[in-house]
């Protein structure tokens, strides 16, 4: 498993921004295609966010709001209400393991290992 504290080639701000964006997209769309290393690191980020969302108190809302982007989809769905009203209730009986990583063939351009990460 990838080291969660490892920073790729960039600084910590770049690293945080990439995983904020990936986590927001995963919550909104349910699955995304990315590199295998990013998927492994994203798994721990998203699972912590969903665990906090299951608490459904003010402190959890503020912590998640400070991390996720407040964007909407084309259908007008906002991230925060969707996470607290649709995603978190699905996992009330589950104590972790909210995501699944499925390996797919390598990318043609640079032969990077690719994966699809999805909410179970």
Curated annotation (Swiss-Prot):
Keyword Coiled coil in record: no
Keywords: Ribonucleoprotein, Ribosomal protein
GO MF assignments: structural constituent of ribosome
Origin: domain of life: Bacteria
Pfam family, any one: Ribosomal_L17
Biological process (GO), any one: translation
GO CC aspect terms: cytosolic large ribosomal subunit
Key word Ribosomal protein present: yes
InterPro entries registered for this protein in UniProt: Ribosomal_bL17, Ribosomal_bL17_CS, Ribosomal_bL17_sf
UniProt record similarity statement: Belongs to the bacterial ribosomal protein bL17 family.
Subunit structure: Part of the 50S ribosomal subunit. Contacts protein L32.
HAMAP family documented for this protein: Ribosomal_bL17
Protein name: Large ribosomal subunit protein bL17
